[in-house]
C-alpha cells in the first residue's frame, strides 16, 4: 500500500502547510478510484527489498551501488519485479547493477536544461507531469531541498516508489497522483518545472497561469515543450493525431510561446534551448517494447511525422514570476 503520511508530516511545518487543507481529501478520493492494474503494480513495489545504497550518485545520473554485490538470486528477483512495472518511459536508472534502459534518455534533456537554471541549492521544487520521477532525483542531486512531483498516471507513481525504495526510502522527493488543475494556488515553490506537458493541454495559457500560481514571488519557471519553426504568430494545431498522439492540441513556435508567457505576466523570458528530438533520445528498448519515435516518423523523410507534420522539435524556455 502506497501511503502519503510521510509527505503530510514533512510539509506540516513548512510553507506548504496550507496544502493540507485540501490534499488529504484529494488523495483519499484517488485511493478509492484506483486503476484495475494498480494493485498488481503496488504489489511489485511492496515485494521489493528496501535497500540503502553504499554509494548514491544523483548528480551525474541516478545510480545506486551496494558495498558488496547482491546475489544473483536477489538481482533476478529485483529485475523481475521492476519489469512488472513496464513500460519504463523516463530514466535511465542504474540500481545495484540493474540498468533500466528507458524509452527516453531523460538524462540528455537534463543536461540541456541544467546549465540555464538558477542554482537549485536549498530550493523547494514542483515538477508537473513528472513521470517516473527521474528528473526529481536529478534535482535533488543538484542540491534541491525538496522535489514534489505531480502526475496522475498510476504506473508512474509505482515506478517512482519502486526506485525510492531501492534508494533507502529517500524522503527528499515525493510524487502525488494529481494533475495541476487539482492544486490550489500555493504560491510556494521556488522553481516549477513543466516538461512535456503543455502540448497536451486544451488550454495552454490556462496551464501557464496554473504554473504561475504555484511559484513564489521571483520564482523560476522551466518550461519544456514541443515547438515548430516560425515567427511569433506561428502555432500548429494538429488534426486527429500528431506523431500518433491523439491528445496534442497546440504547438507554438518558440517566439509565440515567449509571447504567451509574457501575456501571462512572466518576465525575463528567454529561449534557452531548441533541439530536434532524435531516435537515439527516444526509442524502443528492452524496458519499453512497444512503438516509439522511429515508428511515428515518415519512413522516407524523418523531418516529418507519419501525418506529414514537422518532426518533434523541443524548446526550453525560462521565465520569472515578478
Curated annotation (Swiss-Prot):
One of its GO terms (biological process) is tRNA wobble uridine modification. Pfam families: Methyltransf_9. It is an enzyme of class 2 (transferase). The keyword Ribosomal protein does not apply. Carboxy-S-adenosyl-L-methionine binds at residues 90, 104, 109, 129, 151-153, 180-181, 195, 199, 314. It catalyses: carboxy-S-adenosyl-L-methionine + 5-hydroxyuridine(34) in tRNA = 5-carboxymethoxyuridine(34) in tRNA + S-adenosyl-L-homocysteine + H(+). Disulfide bonds: none annotated. The keyword Transferase applies. Keywords: Transferase, tRNA processing. HAMAP family: tRNA_carboxymethyltr_CmoB. Homotetramer. This is tRNA U34 carboxymethyltransferase. The lineage of its organism: Bacteria, Pseudomonadati, Pseudomonadota, Gammaproteobacteria, Enterobacterales.
Amino acid at each position: 500500500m502506497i501511503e502519503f503520511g510521510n509527505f503530510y508530516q514533512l510539509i506540516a511545518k513548512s510553507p506548504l502547510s496550507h496544502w493540507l487543507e485540501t490534499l488529504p481529501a484529494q488523495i483519499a478520493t484517488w485511493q478509492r478510484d484506483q486503476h484495475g492494474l494498480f494493485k498488481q503494480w503496488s504489489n511489485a513495489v511492496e515485494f521489493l527489498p528496501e535497500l540503502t545504497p553504499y554509494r548514491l550518485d544523483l548528480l551525474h545520473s541516478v545510480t545506486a551501488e551496494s558495498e558488496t554485490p547482491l546475489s544473483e538470486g536477489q538481482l533476478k528477483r529485483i529485475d523481475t519485479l521492476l519489469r512488472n512495472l513496464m513500460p519504463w518511459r523516463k530514466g535511465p536508472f542504474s540500481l545495484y547493477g540493474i540498468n533500466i534502459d528507458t524509452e527516453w534518455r531523460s538524462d540528455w534533456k537534463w543536461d540541456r536544461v541544467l546549465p540555464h537554471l538558477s542554482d537549485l541549492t536549498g530550493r523547494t521544487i514542483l515538477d508537473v507531469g513528472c513521470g517516473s520521477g527521474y528528473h526529481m532525483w536529478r534535482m535533488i542531486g543538484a542540491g534541491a531541498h525538496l522535489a514534489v512531483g505531480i502526475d496522475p498516471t498510476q504506473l508512474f507513481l509505482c515506478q517512482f516508489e519502486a526506485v525510492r525504495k531501492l534508494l533507502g526510502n529517500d524522503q527528499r522527493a515525493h510524487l502525488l497522483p494529481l494533475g495541476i488543475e487539482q492544486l490550489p494556488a500555493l504560491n510556494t515553490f521556488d522553481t516549477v518545472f513543466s516538461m512535456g506537458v503543455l502540448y497536451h493541454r486544451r488550454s495552454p495559457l490556462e496551464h501557464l497561469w496554473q504554473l504561475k500560481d504555484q511559484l513564489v514571488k521571483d520564482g523560476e519557471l522551466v518550461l519544456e515543450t514541443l515547438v515548430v519553426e516560425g515567427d511569433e504568430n506561428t502555432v500548429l494545431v494538429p488534426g486527429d493525431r500528431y506523431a500518433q498522439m491523439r491528445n496534442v492540441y497546440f504547438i507554438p513556435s518558440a517566439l509565440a510561446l515567449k509571447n504567451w508567457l509574457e501575456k501571462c505576466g512572466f518576465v525575463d523570458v528567454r529561449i534557452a534551448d531548441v533541439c530536434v528530438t532524435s531516435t537515439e533520445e527516444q526509442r524502443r528498448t528492452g524496458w519499453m517494447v512497444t512503438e516509439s519515435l522511429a515508428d511515428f516518423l515518415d519512413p522516407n523523410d524523418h523531418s516529418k511525422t507519419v501525418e506529414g507534420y514537422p518532426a518533434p522539435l523541443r524548446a526550453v524556455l525560462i521565465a520569472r514570476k515578478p
